Amino acid sequence: MLGDVVEASLAVGRALVVTDDPTVVPPGAEVVVDPGSGLGAAVAAGLARIDGHALIVNADLPAVTPAALRQFADAGLALAAAPDGTTNALSLPDPRVFAPLYGTGSADRFRAHAPFATVDIPELEIDVDADADLDLLDARLGPRTRALLAVPA
């Protein structure tokens, strides 16, 4: 899934991957060392390397496409919420608005923190936290994820 997210991101602009294992980073992406203090700190480490508009896109979104990311960026200050109320992606025209509010109910916390618009972009809605989440994706898998799972096109 990370490969699909990076590929879609590179088609739109830069791709930074915050990780403690640089061997998993696909070609073309920049590695940012994960400070090891949770998702909020990881995102802050990545944002420290970005001037201007940033898209924060979780790596467990196998249906993401370049068109979806362009649409998301065009939404301005926006978030893509998962069905469970967590946050799958943030669009930050000004990265300084970021606050580490991830976790259960994070979409509501982000909206309370700043005037985030909630976007309805199907490719950003479904994250894969469990095997059952894959059933929701049907034909929306990216090419790398499809190949990894050996799902026919």
Which sequence ranges carry the predicted segments?
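General small-molecule cofactor/ligand-binding pocket signal
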Residues: L16, V32, A117-D120
